[in-house]
């Protein structure tokens, strides 16, 4: 592949290989960098997956927002579908949590607000992401959010892009309506998933325990049981709870978070968090128990990908891949 060209960008070196695609660093003739995602040869023969890959490209190439990764073009290389995307450096929030990264409260407030801007933009043009989760929220070297991966996005203006018989999304972050019928969700599913994601970020605890619960039990809990938010700081708990309503029509419009004006519940429960930081995992050097390690490993099976500069490109944890890639 080295030396091949697509849309004026020449492939220079491989960044990584994942379950679905390989990713290359590329430059054009004025040395502008790009990342080129190329679907694996075997999957390039699967029409359902090629359609999904094309869906991502067709949606993202239309998007123009500072908090969403830019797609320059798409086409094919040696018969394999390829997407030419903005080259990013930084890390996604899942990778940061795995590294035991401590987040400032100011950072989390900023990232929530930037996600609000990004999602309000996509929703305003009829696009529902349907897979909001930590690994799809990339933080660049300037500390800003870049929303990734519209591979299972729904375009309300041009069809759903949903394949019959598929389960779309990453289970532990799904909304109740997404569990019930992924083809009928609207923008409010993203509100729920974003709130679940921030519960995870703020508490360091995965929303559901895959070690003690079956997939069915997790889905049943999503539909029928309130998410445990007891570990949240008071201001965030009051702010996020409305977005976690089981009935989509009860969720409010996405709003920016302001720690000064955020409502505070009456409960006087003392927070385990200090005033400046939120601990995402135990600090480096602390030993996890074997049960905790097993829990993290099983939870990771719900949302797993290879880590590299462009790890988001190689995320292969979608349920639809399991459905059609057998």
At which residue positions do the language-model features occur?
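Conserved short submotifs of the Hanks-type protein kinase catalytic core
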Residues: 78-92, 96
């Amino acid at each position: 592949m080295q030396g091949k060209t697509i849309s004026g960008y020449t492939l220079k070196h491989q960044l990584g290989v994942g379950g679905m695609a390989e990713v290359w660093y590329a430059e054009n003739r004025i040395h502008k960098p790009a990342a080129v995602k190329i679907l694996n040869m075997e999957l390039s023969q699967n029409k359902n997956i090629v359609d999904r890959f094309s869906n991502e490209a067709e949606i993202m190439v239309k998007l123009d927002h500072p908090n969403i990764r830019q797609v320059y073009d798409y086409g094919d290389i040696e018969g394999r579908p390829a997407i030419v995307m903005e080259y990013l450096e930084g890390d996604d929030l899942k990778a940061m949590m795995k590294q035991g990264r401590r987040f400032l409260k100011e950072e989390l407030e900023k990232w929530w607000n930037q996600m609000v801007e990004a999602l309000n933009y996509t929703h305003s043009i009829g696009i529902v992401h349907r897979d909001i989760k930590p690994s799809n929220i990339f933080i660049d070297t300037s500390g800003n959010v870049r929303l990734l991966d519209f591979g299972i996005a729904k375009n309300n203006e041009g069809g759903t892009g949903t394949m019959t018989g598929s389960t779309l999304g990453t289970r532990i972050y799904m909304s109740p309506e997404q569990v019930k019928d992924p083809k009928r969700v609207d923008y409010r599913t993203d509100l729920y998933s974003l709130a679940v994601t921030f519960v995870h970020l703020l508490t360091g605890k995965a929303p559901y325990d895959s070690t003690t619960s079956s997939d069915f039990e997790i889905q049943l809990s999503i539909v029928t049981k309130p998410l445990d938010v007891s570990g949240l700081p008071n201001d965030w708990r009051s702010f996020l709870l409305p977005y976690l309503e089981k009935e989509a029509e009860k969720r409010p419009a996405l709003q920016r978070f302001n720690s000064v004006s955020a409502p505070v519940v009456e409960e006087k429960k003392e927070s385990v968090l200090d005033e400046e930081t939120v601990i995402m995992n135990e600090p480096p050097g602390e030993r996890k128990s074997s049960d905790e390690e097993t829990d993290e490993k099983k939870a990771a099976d719900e949302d797993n990908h290879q880590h590299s500069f462009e790890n988001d490109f190689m995320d292969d944890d979608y349920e639809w891949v399991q459905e059609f890639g057998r």
